[in-house]
Amino acid sequence: MQKILIANRGEIAVRIIDSCRAMNIRSVAVYSDEDRNALHVRHADEAVYIGESAVEKSYLNGNSILNAALNCKADGIHPGYGFLSENAQFARDVAQAKLTWIGPSAESMESMASKIEARKLALEHQVPVVPGVVLAADAVPDLEKIGSLGLPLLLKASAGGGGIGMREIHKVEDLDSAIAQGRSQAQRQFGDGSLLIERLLSGARHVEVQVIGDLHSHLLHLHERDCSLQRRRQKLIEEAPAPGLSDDLRKQLQSAALRLAGAVDYHSVGTGGFLVQGDTFFLLEMNTRLQVE
């Protein structure tokens, strides 16, 4: 590739521009009204205006970004993280425009975007999952089956992420209202009212494994990190390597992350997230993007 458009701003855009420069690839920044004098704009070889300050009219405007890439004759688009980085349809649009999407395939993203689909894939590839019940958007909840998981429970929006769409359930009598509220919120915020109800693993550690794959089905892990120190399910500090894990458990986590990535023919950088309790672990999710940290 000779020229890459970076569909992002801030630190990540600057870092991608630096990498392009080191590889003798021309970089194209994009900007909105409020970003026209930002560092990433001044740092890039070229810069293109993509819309008004509201992100819906600029950094989340796939058509504007795609047109900018075509007009400046870029060879590919790097989404960075956030914004359109996990938008499978945008990735598909980029590929259909005969440009290179610098990220995982649309199919990989779609498979992992749904916690329910990710759970199904995990079970098929011997990756442990937390005991739970899948609840389709229009399904009548089997309260007896859900209650048999034991309390407390954690209700998750299937299409949610970043800690959004989660609620704890500590009383059986709260199940009905929690499910109704959870479905309503999930449908409103994510367009999908499907839920996943799992046993809440109190005190479990949050450990992630970074993976990277190429277009020839080669996959590697870049070891693990502990992300347990959080506020409102948002990570504050990460520590690598994760302390206090046995060598055997460390290898099991790394192997599970690679199996999950291989299940969707993953290429690009991604992250397998796991809950670790004692010597056991369970899949949490897979992030199909460059890790923010």
Protein language model regions, located:
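N-terminal beta-alpha lobe that positions the nucleotide/phosphoryl donor
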Residues: 1-272, 276-293
